Amino acid sequence: AFELFLANGVAATTIEEICEHADVANRTFFNHFATRQDMIRALAERRLVNLHDVVFDRADKAIPARLVGVFDDIAAALVGSGDTYREMIGEMLTISGYGIQRGSNLHDTFVELVKEGVARGEVSERHDAETLADIIVGALSGGIVNWTGDRTYSLETNLHNLGVALAELLTTSV
């Protein structure tokens, strides 16, 4: 389905085309996904699984620098992916609730990162990890949503600036 969405666009791709491409009957599709939105939500969750590895493959870097680097890498990957991918990401974010819910893979990745930073003495303890992860995920998804809806929004510049601001928030003490 992901390849079809990229080739044809999200709105133009039908469930029938997805079933034909996957060589499954419509009934089989609906046994797995109650709605088209459920399928897109599942695609979004699969795409986010790799983010955990991206974040934690940088174990040699301090947590604040790692956060900036991850935001930079996400921006570079998305900007280089083309307009159809931009549409697909926007649709995935909208349907998946922007991935900001506590307990989502995206949120849990950043909770783990913050806790690691606290344990290493690189992140301030003045706010709990869940709250800081809420802010990080909100900033990331907000930047991406702005990019999907505004062709003039510089994702690379703005995600970098968001990453830097978040790094300062994580380390600044009162």
Regions found by a protein language model. Name each.
Residues 1-5, 140:
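Short hydrophobic clusters on alpha-helical segments that form packing/core surfaces
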Residues 4, 15, 26, 36:
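Helix-turn-helix DNA-binding elements, focusing on the entry/boundary residues of the two helices
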Residues 11-12, 20-23, 32-56, 60, ...:
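An amphipathic alpha-helix adjacent to DNA-recognition modules
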Residues 40, 44, 48, 96-107, ...:
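Amphipathic, non-transmembrane alpha-helical scaffold segments
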Residues 42, 53-83, 132-136, 159:
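Hydrophobic alpha-helical connector segments
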Residues 76-112:
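Short secondary-structure transition hinges
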Residues 86-90, 119-165:
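Hydrophobic/aromatic-rich alpha-helical bundle segments in the mid-to-C-terminal region
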